[in-house]
Amino acid sequence: MQTTKNQDDLVRIFKAILKEERFGSQSEIVAALQAEGFSNINQSKVSRMLSKFGAVRTRNAKQEMVYCLPAELGVPTAGSPLKNLVLDVDHNQAMIVVRTSPGAAQLIARLLDSIGKPEGILGTIAGDDTIFICPSSIQDIADTLETIKSLFNYAE
């Protein structure tokens, strides 16, 4: 067993361990990583990795609380280009809806609010991964939709 392994191996094995959905505490994850040869791993490092990869605690098939990676892909990072955070753009006769990666909606909404009325956006409401956009004019909603799509290089 090696005493140290590189960062890529650590990330790969960390994700594989979480996919097993059987570790209920950070100390159990530390022990599993140490058993895989990462002797310098500690609880603090595991805690940072859990945050970095968006791990959550949930119930597994045995109804035990365990750490796992969320099913959703595309958790935004500091280096994510904004266009990669927009997953879908759709509309009806009165409103435009933008779906984003989890956690990115408020960032994208702030950008849309900053371009505002000149581009046909009266205002936005953002949750975690969804933005409701109220156009300045319902008659011009198609133009506003195209502006938003072109801003994020979104093609259906």
Swiss-Prot record:
What GO MF annotations does this protein's record show?
arginine binding; DNA binding; DNA-binding transcription factor activity
Query: Does the record's keyword annotation contain Repeat?
Result: no
The record's Pfam families line, in alphabetical order, gives: Arg_repressor, Arg_repressor_C
GO BP terms, alphabetized: L-arginine biosynthetic process; protein complex oligomerization; regulation of arginine biosynthetic process
Q: Which domain of life is it from?
A: Bacteria
Keywords of the record: Amino-acid biosynthesis, Arginine biosynthesis, Cytoplasm, DNA-binding, Repressor, Transcription, Transcription regulation
User: Which Cys residues form disulphide pairs?
Assistant: none
Please state where this protein is localized: Cytoplasm
Give, as in the UniProt entry, the pathway in which the protein acts: Amino-acid biosynthesis; L-arginine biosynthesis [regulation]
Q: Name one GO cellular component term.
A: cytoplasm
> To which protein family does this belong?
Belongs to the ArgR family.
**HAMAP family, per this entry?**
Arg_repressor
Function description: Regulates arginine biosynthesis genes.
**This protein is called what?**
Arginine repressor
Q: Which organism is it from?
A: Shewanella sp. (strain ANA-3)
